[in-house]
Each structure stands twice: as structure tokens, then as C-alpha cells.
């Protein structure tokens, strides 16, 4: 696993396209990679990115965007490793909490997030399209917060 940089935008886009019905495009990813408050983590298999996640921070809060693992590499611990790495980043940066959205019907992802200490914190009705679905907001608080 490594922190992705601007040269990884096309590979990150390919992962997004393989994982989501409404993926981020390369322009959006490039913009996020240039942001000083955003970090992309990528898991590599040889020369190929097989999993990624991005974290955007504002003051002492973190927002997790798009935990993505290529279908052929799922259920191998990659998402677990990405979430654990985000915990480390949150601790290093002194974040009070991390927040994410997940499709209400994506039970495997919701179970994964719960396993990592994320708790439901609210809903966003009709948040997702293609297909239309509610989002569940999930949050994880960190004990180092004062």
C-alpha cells in the first residue's frame, strides 16, 4: 500500500469504473489528488492498483470517499487493510472522527464498516442514483479526541 500521486489518476479511475455505477472520472480524481487536504491510498498487485480509498480532512474531521476493491480481489483483506490504514492516518492527524456514506442495501460493506467501529449516524434519502437508493451515514470516533 502506498499514497497515490497525480501519476496514478488513470489507474485509480480504472478501479472506480470497475467498482461503481457512478464512478469518479479522471478529472475529478486528478483534482482530489492535487488537494492539500486529500490523500488517496492505493493497494498494488504488481503494476496494477487493485484497491483504493481517499480521505479528505477539514480541521479535525475526516470524510472517507469510495472504498474500492476490484471484484477479482475482494474478500482478500484489502478493504480491511485500507480501513486500518485510514485509522492510522486519523490518529496521526489528530482527527476526532471519520465519516462515510454507504448504500443502504450494501450489507457486506456495512458489516465491514461496523467491524471497524463505524456506527450508523443518519440517512440521506435518495442519495444514490443508478440505481436510486438511500445512503447510510456511518461515523467512527477516536478516543484521542479532547
Q: Which role does the model predict for each range below?
A:
Residues 3-74, 83-85, 89, 93, ...:
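Acetyl-CoA-dependent GNAT
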Residues 64, 98-102:
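Conserved hydrophobic beta-strand within the GNAT/NAT acetyltransferase core sheet
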Residues 86-90, 98, 109:
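Short hydrophobic clusters on alpha-helical segments that form packing/core surfaces
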Residues 101, 119-136:
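Conserved catalytic-core motifs of GNAT/GCN5-like acyltransferases
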Residues 113, 118:
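Conserved active-site tyrosine of GNAT-family acetyltransferases
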Residues 132-146:
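Terminal substrate-recognition subdomain of acyl/acetyltransferases
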Amino acid at each position: 500500500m502506498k499514497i497515490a500521486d497525480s501519476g496514478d489518476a488513470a489507474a485509480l479511475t480504472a478501479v472506480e469504473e470497475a467498482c461503481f455505477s457512478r464512478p469518479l472520472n479522471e478529472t475529478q480524481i486528478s483534482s482530489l489528488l492535487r488537494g492539500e487536504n486529500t490523500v488517496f491510498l492505493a493497494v498494488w498487485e504488481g503494476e496494477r492498483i487493485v484497491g483504493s480509498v481517499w480521505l479528505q480532512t477539514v480541521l479535525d474531521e475526516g470524510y472517507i470517499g469510495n472504498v474500492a476493491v476490484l471484484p477479482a480481489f475482494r474478500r482478500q483483506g484489502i478493504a480491511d487493510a485500507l480501513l486500518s490504514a485510514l485509522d492510522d492516518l486519523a490518529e496521526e492527524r489528530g482527527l476526532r472522527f471519520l465519516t462515510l456514506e454507504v448504500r443502504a442495501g450494501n450489507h457486506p460493506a456495512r458489516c465491514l464498516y461496523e467491524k471497524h467501529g463505524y456506527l450508523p449516524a443518519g440517512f440521506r434519502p435518495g442519495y444514490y442514483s443508478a440505481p436510486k437508493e438511500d445512503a447510510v451515514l456511518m461515523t467512527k470516533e477516536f478516543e484521542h479526541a479532547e
